[in-house]
UniProtKB/Swiss-Prot annotation:
Protein name: Small ribosomal subunit protein uS15
CC per GO annotation: cytosolic small ribosomal subunit
Lineage, uppermost ranks: Bacteria, Pseudomonadati, Campylobacterota, Epsilonproteobacteria, Campylobacterales
Protein's organism: Campylobacter jejuni subsp. doylei (strain ATCC BAA-1458 / RM4099 / 269.97)
Entry keyword annotation includes DNA-binding: no
Subunit structure as annotated in this protein's UniProt entry: Part of the 30S ribosomal subunit. Forms a bridge to the 50S subunit in the 70S ribosome, contacting the 23S rRNA.
Length: 90
């Protein structure tokens, strides 16, 4: 369920702080969100794919940890990011 390189480059370009920025928290959260959306669509079709479901839960947990880190360190970019990605604020 990996993202193709064109879609990944598009997400990186949209959320990067500077050119070539692939490791910032915002980019990581955006990439995880795209993978979560793809896995969710996959699991709607293949309901008994339990290994993918476990992978989805791991991705959601990782995104949750990154979002809590971003919320602590830079609340303004956190609030901007969750509005762009249509995520709920906890």
């Amino acid at each position: 369920m990996a993202l193709d390189s064109a879609k990944k480059a598009e997400i990186v370009a949209k959320f990067a702080k500077k050119p070539g920025d692939t490791g910032s928290t915002e980019v990581q959260v955006a990439l995880l969100t795209a993978r979560i959306i793809e896995l969710t669509e996959h699991l709607k079709i293949y309901k008994k794919d339990f290994s993918s479901r476990l992978g989805l839960l791991k991705l959601v947990g990782q995104r949750k940890r990154l979002l809590s880190y971003l919320k602590r360190k830079d609340y303004n970019s956190y609030s901007k990011l969750i509005t762009e990605l249509n995520l709920r604020d906890k």
